[in-house]
């Protein structure tokens, strides 16, 4: 696992939107914006178990993530990693609510099934342009 620098940690600790790239069955990339959180220096993303990214990650755990600072869009980080755990049920909702509070200051709305993918970081890079 790659340790994250303070500038990368700051990007993931803030309410910044990340973009997650996974691989479809045919090898084509699939990229979506996500809310993201930190769990013991690993990354956590939430999704529906029926989503395309969940199907992709269930088949191939490799993932690439980019994130930019919403207040300073020239600051960015790029991550490569792999899913090491899938969390469901009440343990997932605890993580989901922590992530939701970061973005909207309230628990995540209930009513739809959600899971959390825990991502171990293999490579991390940060840069501020300009």
What is each stretch, according to the model?
Residues 2-3, 75-130:
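Charged, gly/pro-rich active-site loop segments
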